[in-house]
Amino acid sequence: MEAPPYSAAAVDVVRLPGGRTERDHVAVEEPLEIRIGGSPVAVTMRTPGHDEELALGFCLSEGLRPEGARVPDDLAANTVDVDAPGFDPARLQRSFYTTSSCGVCGKGALDAVAVESPRVTAELRIPLSLVSSLPDSLRAAQAAFAVTGGLHATGLFSSAGELLCVREDVGRHNALDKVIGWAFGAGRLPLADSVLCVSGRLSFELVQKAAVAGCPVMVAVGAPSSLAVDLAADRGVTLCGFVRGGTANVYTEAWRISG
């Protein structure tokens, strides 16, 4: 699988020891301005590509109900305008600025961060053997990571373990937003019969995005944070961390995992 050309940039690097100068590739990071009905609402640092999905996923994760997204012909390439009829700009009391490492930087309090969503009640049950296979399946699909070593990924899997969508980005929250935006466009929301697998750790924000999308199970090779566990318990999301070598730690709603 070949990495998309917009995801990697060639740079000179000095190899030590030895001092050889060689060409290498690093992940591309650029700003994207998200607008709703022409009004700027957010700037996020992301890896270019699937920008409409990113904007849609971002809006959905903030509790908005968009109808579509487009790159306006009369604006810079790093701008996406989302169509969300009835959106009130005053509803967002702060200006969003999201970095590639922290999607909620600038949110001053937990009350400002939390997005209301129904408790996930999906009766999905999957075996540990399937759960433990997902990180390897995700890694095998990370074409840009193979070139740069510098991108996070989110994979959306069916209840049978089929990879439905994978997105890579310098920001783990962006990768998840892109997958949620893809699912919106594919008519797959809510994700009641699906599993999300993320590279790295499980943060509060990632769990919140999964809950808003209605996904019952999240899988990661890393650990969850305390707030991630608390939120998953509150929203009914099964949280599986340290998934490797046929083992997993299930922090919440363990009844969905057998074995």
Features from the language model and the residues they span:
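Glycine- and Gly-Pro-enriched alpha-helical subdomains that act as flexible
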Residues: A144-G200, V207, V212
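C-terminal binding/interaction regions
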Residues: L163, A223, L227-G259
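A conserved acidic, glycine/proline-rich C-terminal tail/linker
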Residues: G214-S226
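Glycine- and other small-residue-rich loops at beta-strand/loop junctions that grip anionic moieties
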Residues: C102, E168, V195-S199, V221, ...
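Intrinsically disordered, low-complexity regions enriched in acidic/Ser/Thr/Pro/Gln residues
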Residues: M1-S159, L163-V166
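Short, solvent-exposed amphipathic alpha-helical segments in soluble enzyme
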Residues: G49-H50, C59-L60, G171, I180-G185, ...
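Short Gly/Pro-enriched loop/turn and capping motifs at secondary-structure junctions
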Residues: R201-F204, P224-S226
